[in-house]
Amino acid sequence: MGFIDLIEITAAIIALLIAIIGHEIMHGWVAYKYGDMTAKNSGRLSINPLIHIDPFGSILVPLMTYFIPMLMGADSGFLFGWAKPVPIHTNTVIRNGGYNAAMQVSLAGIVYNLFLATFSSVILLSMSQPTEADSIVYVFGYIFILKLLLINVILAVFNLLPIPGFDGAHFISYFTLKYKIYAVAEFFTKAEPYGMIVIIIILVTPLKIPLVMWPIQTVLNLLVG
């Protein structure tokens, strides 16, 4: 493993933590604005990464999808993971703000990721690609911004998919409940224990290309051309 690989891994870890931890904090923060104190009282609105780390989603999944393939010399362009879900008392949110509030909570993390992706793209477009003459600080900064852009786009796209247990499914559930269509929410609730299986199937089969890779490339084209 070369020095540039070490820089890339460090930048990727920091960018991933910023993306996944901020994603969860935003869910809790919006819920807090609608009177749900659960996340705040449990200390989950803190930026301390240790309280947000999920052993599977924050460590094992990134290792499987990015770091191990990279160390083996394979393509390392797909980094995915998640933080420990922030506890939210949805009934409190709905009682205080209705289903619109619940939908806002569902989308809060995605909005955060899209904001960071847009912000990163603006910075990236103002930078020139590093050369051997550039300092280590500049090289690290460029790689970090690039990773921050890629990771946040990946997270936004994945969470928009209607996968049981993920934000897209939660949004659809609350949207249909608002119009008293109960069957959809019941389906997603019953299917939630199988959401992880769906994720694994998407990651290890050709389904990843139309469901994830194409949307990711579309968003990246819109942001940086």
Q: What would you call each of these model-derived segments?
A:
Residues 1-225:
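Hydrophobic transmembrane alpha-helices and their immediate loop junctions
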